[in-house]
């Protein structure tokens, strides 16, 4: 892959609680300009993003029960269903972390319920690796596979740390290529982006997408 093609792996993200209409509008226009795979926005901005991106190939991604994952499964199903009706192409849902750590089968059932309403739309399950040990990351990966998720995602970006290369390696080894992997949170340089893709990340979530692409372009020109 040419380093300039990394744009197609990026979910260009703004999930700030105080994100303004102007910031989301700029996010969408940047995604069009740089050819990012999607924009990832809070549900309140789905319609805004969809309207701006309507004639472009850029997808609209949103979040469910973000960033804590602590609401009822029924509420997560409702949020996902409503988000898709509003125009979301992809759903990033936060799992119930304590139940995941406790090994509750309800986690798998919750993923299945949300995936059912997603249908052919993409479901990514956020497991917040900062709060898990290595064995729990392995179990989380298997739970996402059993629940029928399309992706397992490392982080919300709101916890004690974002993605690590070791997180991706563990997920890759545990999954045996049965699920895609999204790395998000804290990826701030082009070299980090390249390393995450090398170890197995299929998608990258970042708010620094434009900076990364500019760095990648410089690296490409320096060859």
UniProtKB/Swiss-Prot annotation:
UniProt cross-references to InterPro entries, sorted A to Z: Aldolase_TIM, DeoC, DeoC/FbaB/LacD_aldolase, DeoC_typeI
Any GO MF annotation of the entry: deoxyribose-phosphate aldolase activity
Main subcellular location: cytoplasm
Source organism of this protein record: Mycoplasmoides gallisepticum (strain R(low / passage 15 / clone 2))
Entry's localization field: Cytoplasm
Name recorded for this polypeptide: Deoxyribose-phosphate aldolase
Entry keyword set: Cytoplasm, Lyase, Schiff base
Entry similarity comment: Belongs to the DeoC/FbaB aldolase family. DeoC type 1 subfamily.
Active site: residue positions: 92, 153, 182
Catalytic activity: 2-deoxy-D-ribose 5-phosphate = D-glyceraldehyde 3-phosphate + acetaldehyde
Record's GO cellular component terms: cytoplasm
Role, per record: Catalyzes a reversible aldol reaction between acetaldehyde and D-glyceraldehyde 3-phosphate to generate 2-deoxy-D-ribose 5-phosphate.
CDD domains documented for this protein: DeoC
Keyword Secreted: no
Leader sequence residues: none
Pathways per UniProt: Carbohydrate degradation; 2-deoxy-D-ribose 1-phosphate degradation; D-glyceraldehyde 3-phosphate and acetaldehyde from 2-deoxy-alpha-D-ribose 1-phosphate: step 2/2
Enzyme class: lyase
EC number(s) from the headed UniProt entry: 4.1.2.4
GO biological process terms, semicolon-separated: 2-deoxyribose 1-phosphate catabolic process; carbohydrate catabolic process; deoxyribonucleotide catabolic process
Pfam families found in the cross-reference section: DeoC
SMART domains: DeoC (SM01133)
């Amino acid at each position: 892959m040419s380093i300039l093609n990394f744009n197609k792996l990026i979910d260009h993200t703004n999930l700030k609680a105080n994100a303004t209409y102007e910031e989301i509008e700029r996010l969408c226009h940047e995604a069009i300009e740089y050819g990012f795979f999607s924009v990832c926005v809070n549900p309140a901005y789905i319609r805004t993003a969809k309207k701006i991106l309507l004639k472009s190939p850029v997808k609209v991604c949103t979040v469910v029960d973000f960033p804590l994952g602590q609401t009822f499964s029924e509420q997560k199903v409702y949020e996902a269903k409503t988000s898709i009706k509003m125009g979301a192409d992809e759903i990033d849902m936060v799992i119930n972390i304590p139940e995941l750590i406790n090994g509750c089968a309800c986690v798998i059932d919750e993923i299945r319920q949300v995936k059912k309403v997603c249908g052919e739309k993409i479901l990514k399950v956020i497991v917040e690796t900062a709060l898990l040990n290595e064995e729990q990351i392995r179990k989380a990966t298997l739970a996402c596979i059993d629940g029928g998720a399309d992706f397992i995602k490392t982080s919300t970006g709101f916890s004690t740390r974002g993605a690590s290369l070791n997180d991706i390696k563990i997920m890759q080894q545990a999954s045996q290529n049965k699920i895609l992997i999204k790395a998000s949170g804290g990826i701030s340089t082009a070299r980090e982006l390249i390393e995450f893709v090398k170890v197995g990340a299929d998608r990258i979530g970042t708010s620094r997408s434009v900076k990364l692409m500019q760095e990648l372009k410089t690296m490409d020109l320096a060859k």
